[in-house]
């Protein structure tokens, strides 16, 4: 059986009229028999799609022909079955809701740490400057329960809009440490890292590409359990395979 290719991708980029993209997205993804969800907002695009390999690549070629999405990076995995039941393209106020409009990743990101560097930091327990390393899980509590980085902070938030208050409540404990925010695919931890930096936390990084990119580029060292995903696969192990 030919494997189903799954992609997750996002980009923070100004979209003046996101509603104008909805029908073209539905048409291009639909004619390729892709399923999943695409979120469009004035701040950018966030998508999770699955289908045949050539269909996925064809859709990405079409999408990247738009200059706003030319450098869109996708994270890949495979599954034996289609993990989505239908195709949805939704227009939202934010592609990941935080309710802090001043946080605009397109205007400037927090520093990012790549998977290989993080793996080394985890092994040594410190960053390259010798600062204590703190892994901060920015996901919802039910996601964290499926799996997270060993020893990671879990503030037990129920939705991402609670993250800013959690930072205010816990900021003092992060002083002088290197904080790496992480999430499933990178989108939440990107906003989270910007918020923390603007709140005055000095040494803040985001995990480039999130947990999924860490699994893709390393052996998953330091991660306990599996990564929850919002589709019928439920969770992926470090080999990006659905957890049995």
Swiss-Prot record:
Keywords on record: Oxidoreductase, tRNA processing
A GO MF term: oxidoreductase activity, acting on paired donors, with incorporation or reduction of molecular oxygen
Catalytic residues in the record: 183 (cysteine persulfide intermediate)
Limits of the Rhodanese domain: 129-219
GO biological process: tRNA modification
Protein EC: 1.14.-.-
Reactions mediated catalytically: uridine(34) in tRNA + AH2 + O2 = 5-hydroxyuridine(34) in tRNA + A + H2O
Enzyme class: oxidoreductase
Pfam families: Rhodanese, UPF0176_N
Keyword tRNA processing recorded: yes
Stated family: Belongs to the TrhO family.
Free-text function comment from the UniProt entry: Catalyzes oxygen-dependent 5-hydroxyuridine (ho5U) modification at position 34 in tRNAs.
Protein name according to UniProt: tRNA uridine(34) hydroxylase
